[in-house]
């Protein structure tokens, strides 16, 4: 199949995936008026049909659409061309009938901003890589020293009280407009409280499950950051009980206007990658023959994130130029990377450990550009081996 035809098929598949994600968001929004929900679902159905061949589009009515959203997505998507992806078997609702945490990120990462969509969805929506770019456009205006400070703060202070955040961000505080009030985010509130993830400090999602709530970090639940919340019988917060191996004790904070958090895009594409970089730095710290530089560029500190050098006497030096990524979809990440002008050869893209099984898919997309793909744990083992240190 010609390259142009493969690209067109992939665009139609992205369009259908976007429609499904948007429909799930509409279906699961508890405050959306029924009339508004119906109109949004009709919009989504129109976009989905437009992605299919006419004979298949005629077979998908509203009943088939809504039923299809409750199971694996394969029957709703145009066939994949070339290398298969994971979306045929993906389900957007969980076992409790609630939208999966990642739906919003998948939607923004696969959104096709073209006229065919805009005629159905006139509201402004921005591709994920454009939001990522907006963040780093602000960052690039900082001096190298300020840039490194801001990147670190995105990882360590992405949410909290206004007093604490302004103290930590200090002179950088007034230069960022990415913070929003937790009081405006009902999805993370329970009994007037919110719980920061012990890993990223961002608000954890609270989902009612019978008389209790499931509380989990959207990004770190695979690592065991999830809890069960029991409603309080009196004043004050209820009881939060860990249900995962990484569910350490967390202090509840009031869901008031003086508690802020970076917006979702900054958390996904700013905070989470920094945490991967800091995790890697901390795991490798103290190894013999090792030198590490965080955001090393003086002219362009954002060129890549971490430079690792291993210089064992009598052996050739080993270098890793690391760029951490925390996209929900490695398919969309691969397309964004291949479209990026001047992608540096010799770069190593590092993914979270829970995307280990997907790293080969991304590697196949960027291999021709001289870029390698691995995960945090795999790279840490490789560097330790190069240093001659025990794993």
Over which residues does each language-model region extend?
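Conserved catalytic cores of phosphodiester-cleaving nucleases, focusing on short active-site segments
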Residues: 280, 284, 304-334
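Metal-dependent nuclease catalytic core centered on acidic motifs
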Residues: 94, 137-145, 250-255, 357-365, ...
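Acidic-basic catalytic patches of nuclease active cores, encompassing PD-(D/E)XK
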Residues: 240-298
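C-terminal helix of von Willebrand factor
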Residues: 372-391
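Catalytic cores of nucleic-acid endonucleases
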Residues: 324-372
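Nuclease-adjacent, charged terminal/linker segments that flank catalytic cores
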Residues: 3-250
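A structural signal for short secondary-structure junctions
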Residues: 299-301, 314, 341-344
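Beta-rich nucleic-acid/ligand-interaction surfaces
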Residues: 212, 298-309
């Amino acid at each position: 199949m010609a390259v142009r035809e493969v690209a067109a098929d992939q665009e139609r598949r992205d369009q259908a995936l976007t429609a499904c994600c948007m429909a799930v968001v509409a279906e699961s929004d508890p405050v959306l008026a029924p009339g508004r929900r119906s109109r949004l679902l009709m919009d989504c159905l129109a976009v989905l049909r437009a992605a299919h061949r006419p004979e298949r589009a005629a077979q998908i009515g509203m009943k088939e659409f809504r039923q299809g959203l409750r199971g694996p997505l394969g029957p709703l998507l145009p066939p994949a061309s070339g290398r298969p992806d994971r979306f045929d078997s993906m389900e957007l609702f969980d076992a409790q009938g609630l939208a999966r945490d990642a739906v919003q990120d998948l939607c923004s990462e696969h959104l096709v901003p073209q006229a065919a969509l805009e005629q159905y969805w006139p509201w402004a929506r921005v591709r994920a890589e454009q939001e990522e770019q907006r963040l780093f456009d602000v960052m690039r205006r900082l001096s190298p020293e300020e840039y490194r400070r801001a990147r670190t703060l995105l990882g360590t202070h992405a949410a909290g009280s206004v007093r604490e955040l302004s103290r930590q961000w200090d002179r950088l505080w007034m230069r960022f407009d990415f913070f929003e009030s937790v009081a405006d985010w009902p999805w993370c509130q329970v009994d007037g409280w919110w719980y920061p993830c012990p890993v990223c400090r961002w608000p954890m999602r609270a989902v009612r499950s019978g008389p209790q709530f499931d509380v989990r970090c959207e990004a770190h639940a695979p690592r065991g950051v999830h809890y069960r919340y029991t409603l309080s019988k009196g004043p004050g917060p209820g009881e939060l009980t860990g249900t995962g191996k990484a569910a350490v004790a967390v202090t509840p904070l009031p869901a008031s206007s003086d508690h802020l958090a970076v917006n979702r895009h900054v958390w996904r594409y700013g905070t989470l990658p920094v945490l991967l970089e800091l995790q890697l730095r901390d795991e490798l710290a103290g190894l013999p023959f090792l030198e590490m530089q965080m955001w090393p560029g003086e002219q362009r500190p954002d060129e890549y994130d971490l430079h690792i050098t291993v210089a064992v006497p009598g052996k050739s030096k080993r270098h890793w130029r690391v760029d951490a990524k925390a996209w929900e979809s490695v398919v969309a990440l691969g397309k964004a990377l291949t479209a990026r002008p001047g992608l540096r050869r010799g770069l190593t893209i590092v993914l979270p450990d829970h995307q280990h099984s997907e790293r080969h898919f991304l590697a196949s997309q960027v291999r021709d550009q001289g870029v390698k793909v691995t995960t945090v744990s795999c790279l840490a083992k490789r560097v330790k081996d190069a240093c001659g240190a025990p794993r």
